[in-house]
């Protein structure tokens, strides 16, 4: 509940309008190969209609993970069951799903509801049933109940999805996370908008509107702040904004380029690109003291820094080899090594949270696509087949990448799993959308 309460506190501060999806997720590839799972509508145990369909949130999350495919409720052998006590293992022998999610919702005081859910291992339940009557503890993977308010239904649905996903895959779910991005709508006087939304595009909220460009939003490790570049004062400047207090702090306003901020793993510093001394170079700036340290020193352009999870190295894009490629610099020694070699260009890299892979933009035969490279084997896999892909950002559990692309002549967001199997598009209703950034776990 501590994690849920923290997320809900942020959601309440940001949300001033009813939940809605400004970015509708359109799945384009990968559902057929997903793992079958059964999610029953949660049984409402109160008068009138249920406040919200919490199971719909869970089903949508599991589909969007690219890992699971919820079965059609009409084909399930049992209907209107909400507890493990009502579950009949023998009835599910021909379903083919690996797990079942079911639950109940009932009033629990003024604007309070008790939500209970069970996660059943169907394979184990059926195997045990062949041996005779067994206790539910033999196949019950998880069972929880929580009191929530009406405003918390959607968020708690995401929490259930996180639990189910982790129990079945061993990987922490990332459904209680958010994304930030920039919307550009030139029909408005101030066309540039810095936005934050739930990972699925719901609860979109505007943090800043400007007549001048906004770009490169990035999250702090605690999920409390965003750093971004603003041209509101007719020049590039880097700001850090607290999402709870809305307080903005100008961190960097040197002559020339101030760009590509990236929070250090401890949240105390930003790696940034500055051109105050000539060519664009990589620097680290202390957010509190504004003290800066130059990291690279080369006649070529160095930009787009990103941290290794251990905070001991940075990767960055450089033209020092003649074309944009990704390099690594060790902060203790200053040693620089080239990381990418395949294709014509490689740029905009970031390291996955487990430190095992790098996600970046690869240009081959003139096409810009999102790619992944295993840092041990150096094997590179192109993940996308969209066009003009840019700005990849990795989910905190390392399973998905959100990025900018072009669709039907407009800049939109898209997502791809890090194995390249699942793909989705997030078209916006109005304007163009770019510069996505996925939050840490909240």
From Swiss-Prot:
Residues 1-21 form the signal peptide. Its main location: periplasm. Keywords: Cell cycle, Cell division, Periplasm, Signal. It is found in: Periplasm. One of its GO terms (cellular component) is periplasmic space. Pfam families: PD40, TolB_N. GO terms for biological process: cell division; protein import. The keyword Signal applies. Disulfide bonds: none annotated. Gene3D superfamilies: TolB, C-terminal domain (2.120.10.30), TolB, N-terminal domain (3.40.50.10070). The keyword Flavoprotein does not apply. The Tol-Pal system is composed of five core proteins: the inner membrane proteins TolA, TolQ and TolR, the periplasmic protein TolB and the outer membrane protein Pal. They form a network linking the inner and outer membranes and the peptidoglycan layer. PANTHER family: PROTEIN TOLB (PTHR36842:SF1), PROTEIN TOLB HOMOLOG (PTHR36842). Belongs to the TolB family. Part of the Tol-Pal system, which plays a role in outer membrane invagination during cell division and is important for maintaining outer membrane integrity. This is Tol-Pal system protein TolB. It comes from Shewanella baltica (strain OS185).
């Amino acid at each position: 509940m501590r994690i849920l309460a923290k997320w809900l506190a942020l959601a309440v501060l940001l949300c001033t309008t009813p939940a809605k999806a400004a970015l509708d997720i359109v799945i384009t590839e990968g559902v057929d190969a997903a793992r079958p799972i059964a999610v029953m509508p949660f049984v409402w145990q109160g008068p009138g209609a249920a406040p919200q369909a919490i199971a719909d949130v869970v089903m949508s999350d599991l589909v969007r993970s690219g890992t699971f495919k919820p079965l059609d409720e009409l084909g399930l052998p049992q209907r209107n069951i909400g507890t493990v006590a009502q579950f009949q293992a023998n009835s599910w022998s021909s379903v083919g799903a690996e797990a079942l999610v079911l639950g109940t919702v009932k009033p629990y005081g003024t604007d309070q509801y008790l939500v209970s859910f069970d996660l059943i291992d169907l394979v184990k339940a059926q195997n045990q049933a062949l041996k005779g009557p067994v206790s539910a503890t033999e196949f019950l993977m998880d069972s929880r109940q929580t009191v929530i308010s009406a405003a918390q239904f959607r968020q708690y649905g995401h929490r259930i999805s996180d639990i189910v996903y982790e129990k079945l895959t061993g990987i922490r779910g990332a459904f209680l996370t958010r994304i930030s991005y920039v919307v550009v709508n030139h029909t408005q006087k101030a066309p540039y908008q810095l936005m934050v939304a739930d990972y699925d595009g719901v609860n979109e909220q505007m943090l800043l509107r400007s007549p001048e460009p906004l770009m490169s939003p990035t999250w702090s490790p605690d999920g409390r702040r965003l750093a971004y570049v603003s041209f509101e004062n007719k020049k590039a400047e880097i700001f850090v904004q607290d999402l709870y207090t809305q307080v903005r702090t100008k961190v960097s306003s040197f002559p020339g380029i101030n760009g590509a901020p990236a929070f250090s793993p401890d949240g105390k510093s930003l790696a940034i690109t500055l051109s105050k001394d000539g060519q664009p170079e990589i620097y680290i700036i202390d957010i509190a003291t504004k003290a800066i340290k130059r990291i690279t020193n080369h006649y070529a352009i160095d930009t787009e820094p990103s941290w290794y999870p251990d905070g001991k190295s940075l990767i960055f894009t450089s033209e020092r080899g003649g074309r944009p490629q990704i390099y690594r610099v060790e902060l203790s020694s200053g040693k620089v090594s080239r990381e990418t070699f395949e294709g014509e260009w490689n740029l905009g890299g970031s390291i996955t949270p487990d430190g095992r892979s790098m996600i970046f933009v690869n240009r081959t035969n003139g096409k810009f696509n999102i790619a992944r490279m295993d840092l041990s084997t150096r094997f590179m896999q192109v993940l996308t087949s969209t066009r003009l892909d840019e700005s990849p950002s990795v989910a905190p559990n390392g399973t998905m990448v959100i990025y900018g692309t072009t669709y039907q002549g407009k800049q939109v967001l898209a997502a791809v799993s890090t194995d390249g199997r699942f793909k989705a598009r997030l078209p916006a209703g109005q304007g163009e959308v770019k510069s996505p950034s996925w939050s840490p776990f909240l």
